[in-house]
C-alpha cells in the first residue's frame, strides 16, 4: 500500500515557506509569534539553504 506522506521540497516551500507565510495575515501572525518565542528557524524556506554543504 502506498503511504500518504510523499515528501517534495518544492511543495514544502510553497506551502510552508517564508513567502507563503508573508502572503496572508495569519501567516504573518505565525512569523511574529515565532520571532517572539526566539525560534532558530522562522520557516521552512529560511532553513533550506543552510542544510546543504
From Swiss-Prot:
One of its GO terms (cellular component) is ribonucleoprotein complex. InterPro entries: Ribosomal_bL34, Ribosomal_bL34_CS. GO terms for biological process: translation. It comes from the Bacteria. Residues 42-53 have a biased composition (Polar residues). Residues 1-53 are annotated as: Disordered. Keywords: Ribonucleoprotein, Ribosomal protein. Residues 1-19, 26-40 have a biased composition (Basic residues). GO terms for molecular function: structural constituent of ribosome. Belongs to the bacterial ribosomal protein bL34 family. This is Large ribosomal subunit protein bL34. It comes from Prosthecochloris aestuarii (strain DSM 271 / SK 413). The lineage of its organism: Bacteria, Pseudomonadati, Chlorobiota, Chlorobiia, Chlorobiales.
Amino acid at each position: 500500500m502506498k503511504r500518504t506522506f510523499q515528501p517534495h521540497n518544492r511543495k514544502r516551500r510553497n506551502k510552508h515557506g517564508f513567502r507563503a507565510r508573508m502572503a496572508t495575515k495569519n501567516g504573518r501572525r505565525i512569523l511574529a509569534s515565532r520571532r517572539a518565542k526566539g525560534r532558530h528557524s522562522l520557516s521552512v524556506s529560511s532553513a533550506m539553504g543552510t542544510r546543504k554543504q
